[in-house]
Design a protein with these regions (language model features):
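HINT superfamily self-processing domains
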Residues: 1-161, 165-171
């Protein structure tokens, strides 16, 4: 069962070069997304990782936030001391000149992740941390990616089955 999320406090890239902590986002705000040519644009995580491309090209766009989900998760991964993310969350990976979506738990030292500055950063440190934390995910309207602490991540399924609290972004 999927709980693909990022931790509370993660900065999400919005329009106009603005960033905001994920837990402070509201429905109707626009976040920065990235569509990759040749890789299926789907919210169905069962299809992710099945397509690999040898030429990485894509396009930045802005997507409307529809919902934000809050949950707890008993462990997470910390990548390069910058990105804290649950094990089943998908990130775009470069390995051996191939590009594809991969679950965080399958990443290895030496793999590279796509960054907001249009570059790939090599993973030099990845740690699994066994500690319960509050986590969040975002539902957007069409391109199912966003930048979390500067890394491109996929938002997974809109029908996240373990969501305990669907905010619908009703922040007072």
């Amino acid at each position: 069962m999927s709980k693909n999320c990022v931790l509370k406090g993660t900065l999400i890239q919005l329009e106009n070069d603005e960033t905001k902590e994920i837990e402070l986002l509201k429905a109707g705000e626009k976040l920065l997304s990235y569509s990759i040519e040749g890789i299926e644009n789907t919210q169905d995580v069962s299809l992710l990782g099945k397509t690999k491309v040898n030429n990485f090209e894509g396009e930045f766009s802005y997507q409307l936030i529809k919902n934000i989900w809050k949950n707890t998760f008993e462990s997470y991964y910390k990548i390069n001391n910058e990105l804290s993310i649950t094990e089943d969350h998908y990130v775009i990976c470069k390995k051996n000149d191939e590009y594809y979506w991969i679950q965080v738990e399958n990443l290895k030292i030496g793999d590279s992740l796509f960054k907001l500055d249009n570059s790939f950063e090599e993973i030099k440190d990845i740690q699994k941390i066994e500690e319960e934390k509050t986590v969040y995910n975002i539902q957007v309207n069409s391109i199912y990616t966003f930048f979390a602490n500067g890394y491109l991540v996929h938002n997974g399924s809109a029908n996240c089955p373990n969501v305990t609290d669907c905010y619908a972004c009703y922040h007072a």
